Amino acid sequence: MSNWLVDKLIPSIMRSEVKKSSVPEGLWHKCPSCEAVLYRPELEKTLDVCPKCNHHMRIGARARLNIFLDVEGREELGADLEPVDRLKFRDGKKYKDRLTAAQKQTGEMDALISMSGTLLGMPVVASAFEFSFMGGSMGAIVGERFVRAANYALENRCPMICFAASGGARMQEALISLMQMAKTSAVLARLREEGLPFISVLTDPVYGGVSASLAMLGDVIVAEPKALIGFAGPRVIEQTVREKLPEGFQRSEFLLDHGAIDMIISRSELRPRLGNLLAQMMNLPTPRFVAPVIEPIVVPPAPATI
């Protein structure tokens, strides 16, 4: 028995440990929809869209702006703004501590990034929510960064695009966060008065005070495939109305069928299609889009588990 342990079992365990340690962390990713094991470099080439089932995975705000805007000429707006715990709010944890943890986790100061730049050579300003930062919740800094982006559009006579991904208003800022709904809506009214386009792109998920304000105020409202969009969550609605909701309720396809949004665009098509749309809205020549050359990647065998 002892010889079997020494000769067979222990070497087997050691080989298993070596195999596990030889796989770099983050090299493989499991699709949350079809559970396919995907090679991270290959997934980056598809803009974090599963090549097996077309599931659009959540991506960070900075990554989203980097793949949407042209490489040259980007400038971040409102980067100097930092959140302040004016109310000294505390639930199960101090708001100040929640901010510190979110900043450490994401590397961002708050849940919205705004940048000026170009889209296919056309001047634009774009904002994107960082859902990993406290659920992309909207507080004072999110509202102010959004307003600064809109003011940039007003000053430079350029269109604005916003990628929404949020659970709603930030409860730790109470009325201050609710005020951002009116603040962002007011500046969008100014854009409309000046005839400057605002395109809202709804990504997974968009809920609460963000869906009840800026996210649904676009001149054109676009959504990514199968994004969850609503005000209250489906479970809350079912408990309130005491009825089973339809299949796919609050998915972008359901909203498109019922006239709540204008179109659904896959992530890889956002640059050319929004570029063409904005050029028409601004009465500019149709921009030329050159699709990037995607070089083939040698995908190693996937591990049994990740």
From Swiss-Prot:
Lipid biosynthesis as UniProt keyword: yes
Similarity field: Belongs to the AccD/PCCB family.
Subunit structure: Acetyl-CoA carboxylase is a heterohexamer composed of biotin carboxyl carrier protein (AccB), biotin carboxylase (AccC) and two subunits each of ACCase subunit alpha (AccA) and ACCase subunit beta (AccD).
Keyword Transferase: yes
Domain of life per record: Bacteria
Involved pathway(s): Lipid metabolism; malonyl-CoA biosynthesis; malonyl-CoA from acetyl-CoA: step 1/1
Name this protein carries in UniProt: Acetyl-coenzyme A carboxylase carboxyl transferase subunit beta
Localization: Cytoplasm
Enzyme class: transferase
Organism: Pseudomonas savastanoi pv. phaseolicola (strain 1448A / Race 6)
Family matches, as NCBIfam families: accD
Organism phylogeny: Bacteria, Pseudomonadati, Pseudomonadota, Gammaproteobacteria, Pseudomonadales
EC number: 2.1.3.15
Role according to the record: Component of the acetyl coenzyme A carboxylase (ACC) complex. Biotin carboxylase (BC) catalyzes the carboxylation of biotin on its carrier protein (BCCP) and then the CO(2) group is transferred by the transcarboxylase to acetyl-CoA to form malonyl-CoA.
Cellular-component GO terms for this entry: acetate CoA-transferase complex
GO BP term, example: fatty acid biosynthetic process
